[in-house]
């Protein structure tokens, strides 16, 4: 008899699990807000970010010149700088005040200053200098200014060395110009571009943030539709912790398997971003990342009291999470406190592991730290979600019983009055 009851309970639990999965799946596609965060945002945001940074590098940065030397050598230097793809000289200013005013009016983003003793020092065999002033509100402007001027100065240094060496053969000129021959190879980012460096991290973060917003919005809707403002409704199918957590989690997981494939595989391929990882390693890595994000979002949804709250709580976290992940800002430069704070979020391990696998060709064993951390987070947040929903079930029952007693007392009171 006990075996039959146990089998019935298991069968009922599985039936309830799929009922909850079905209801949550329907909510995803019927609720416009959830649909936006689960489908439209993951479809649109990756394309938007990728289109913005598709050029990879900034070209033809407007720059102005203050040339106090007025020599043939300074003019040669400026012609070569203007010939680079990085800088476009838009004006020659009489003094630094005029140049500063052009920067202030956003007509240029950098100043090239050549001192009056530029060619004299070179003729005397002394070291000279060229000063660069750049608008640091955009680091890519600074990068273009620095690269162009560095390349031109090195090229002119080579020509000056050769001219003064008195060599008689081309081979001697080569040795004079480059005593140590070197070859520059950009590993894992051949274009040294901004998109190849930043977009993979943004794509991984989009998955976590849209899950937080979508699940939070669904939780806010559930509370608003509940008579007692509880997260779990009074329903015989919602009479167990595991069936609720697994039913909801399975629904989100099935939706985001497709979303993750699009965001992490299709989008990088559309924009020709670096993809050298093994697909099998990537799939095995994404599974715990999705699980950790889903249960993390379900745990965090306990704080959501209405539909709008999730926007106030979660949206602003995107930029800080990108910084403390260790990709856009060097991990070694992040203070220990913020590094430990970053370990709370699945995106930290997800971003670092994905970049290593997808962009650097790492295997699963080479990202063992991130992989194990994601499974650990998935387990911890699963238990936290179970605790949260168990507490919500008890609170829902408590409110229902209190309401029942209240109605019963009113009924008894009305009978006494009528008698």
Give the role of each language-model region.
Residues 1-196, 366, 391, 397-419:
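Extracytoplasmic/periplasmic domains immediately adjacent to an N-terminal transmembrane anchor
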Residues 37-38, 200, 246-247, 310-313, ...:
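Hydrophobic core positions of alpha-helical segments in small-molecule transporters
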Residues 38-39, 196-197, 316-317, 342:
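Hydrophobic alpha-helical transmembrane segments of integral membrane proteins
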Residues 44-47, 185-267:
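Hydrophobic alpha-helical transmembrane segments of multi-pass membrane transport proteins
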Residues 48-49, 70, 91, 101, ...:
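Membrane-spanning alpha-helical segments of multipass transporters and channels
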């Amino acid at each position: 008899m006990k075996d039959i009851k146990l089998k019935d309970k298991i069968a009922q639990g599985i039936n309830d699990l799929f009922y909850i999965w079905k209801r949550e799946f329907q909510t995803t596609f019927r609720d416009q807000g959830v649909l936006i965060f689960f489908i439209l945002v993951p479809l649109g945001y990756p394309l938007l970010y990728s289109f913005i940074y598709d050029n990879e590098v900034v070209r033809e940065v407007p720059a102005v010149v203050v040339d106090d030397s007025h020599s043939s050598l300074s003019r040669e230097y400026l012609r070569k700088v203007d010939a680079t793809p990085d800088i476009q000289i838009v004006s020659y200013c009489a003094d630094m005040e005029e140049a500063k005013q052009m920067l202030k009016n956003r007509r240029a983003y950098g100043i090239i200053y050549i001192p009056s003793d530029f060619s004299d020092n070179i003729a005397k065999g002394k070291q000279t200098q060229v000063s660069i002033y750049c608008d640091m509100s955009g680091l890519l402007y600074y990068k273009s200014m620095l690269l162009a001027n560095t390349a031109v100065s090195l090229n002119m240094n080579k020509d000056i060395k050769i001219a003064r060496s008195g060599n008689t053969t081309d081979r001697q000129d080569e040795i004079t110009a480059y005593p140590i021959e070197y070859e520059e190879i950009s590993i894992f980012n051949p274009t040294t571009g901004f998109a190849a460096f930043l977009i993979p991290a943004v794509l991984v973060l989009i998955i976590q943030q849209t899950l937080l917003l979508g699940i939070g919005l669904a939780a806010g809707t559930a509370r608003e539709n509940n008579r007692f403002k509880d997260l779990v409704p009074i329903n015989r199918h919602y009479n167990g912790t595991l069936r609720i957590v697994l039913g909801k989690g399975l629904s989100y997981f099935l939706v985001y398997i497709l979303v993750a494939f699009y965001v992490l595989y299709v989008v990088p391929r559309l924009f020709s971003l670096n993809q050298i990882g093994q697909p099998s390693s990537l799939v095995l890595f994404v599974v715990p990342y999705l699980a950790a994000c889903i249960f993390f979002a379900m745990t965090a949804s306990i704080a959501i009291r209405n539909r709008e709250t999730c926007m106030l709580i979660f949206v602003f976290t995107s930029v800080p999470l990108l910084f403390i992940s260790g990709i856009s800002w060097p991990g070694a430069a992040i203070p220990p406190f913020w590094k430990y704070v970053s370990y709370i979020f699945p995106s930290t391990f997800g971003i670092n592991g994905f970049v290593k696998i997808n962009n650097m060709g790492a295997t699963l064993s080479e990202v063992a730290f991130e992989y194990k951390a994601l499974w650990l987070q998935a387990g911890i947040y699963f238990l936290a979600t179970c605790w949260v929903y168990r507490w919500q079930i008890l609170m829902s029952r408590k409110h229902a019983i209190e309401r029942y007693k209240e109605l019963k007392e009113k009924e008894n009171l009305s009978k006494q009055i009528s008698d």
